Amino acid sequence: MSTVATTETKPAPAAIEKIKVKVDGREIEVPRLTADWSGKLTPTTMIQACELAKTEVPHYCYHPKLPVPGNCRMCLVEYGTPALGPDRKPVLNADGTPKIAKSPRPAISCATPISPGMEIYTSTPGVKQMREGVLESLLINHPLDCPICDQAGECKLQEYSVDYGQSASRFAEAKVHKPKAVDLSLIHI
């Protein structure tokens, strides 16, 4: 009895459309769709476009393999999209480039999908000020007492507090210290 090996060929996946966006003034091409945490194709988000542009956007709650909670707000960015006229066609500047209509408010980059011609601004003074405010509210009940922390200095909260100049909170309330469920000093190995 002989067996013949057969090679099964799978059809190539359809080419995913690429679109042009600008991240901090640098134009890049990114796929319109990317696989989400479950493998399903979903619209590419601003934070994914920034990662492809090698531009770091600080974040705590975003992870590419998990659903997007959008809770931490550290990934706030400013953005603009091509302005459209009454005929739904892009309004052009004198030099022929599309006029960009800047959004009146920031967006969380982990949950906002990109669109063709979008411009993303990750380091404007307004973005930095917003991140400082978000970080300050996160530090209200979190002491930066790193020697006793389990993370032992490998902590994004500590890194971002240094990057954004928040070594202490302006709020004078006492920190919330809850008792541990299990007193670790009683455990003997």
Segments predicted by a language model, with ranges:
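Intrinsic disorder at enzyme termini
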Residues: 1-14
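Eukaryote-biased recognition of intrinsically disordered, low-complexity regulatory segments
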Residues: 15-26
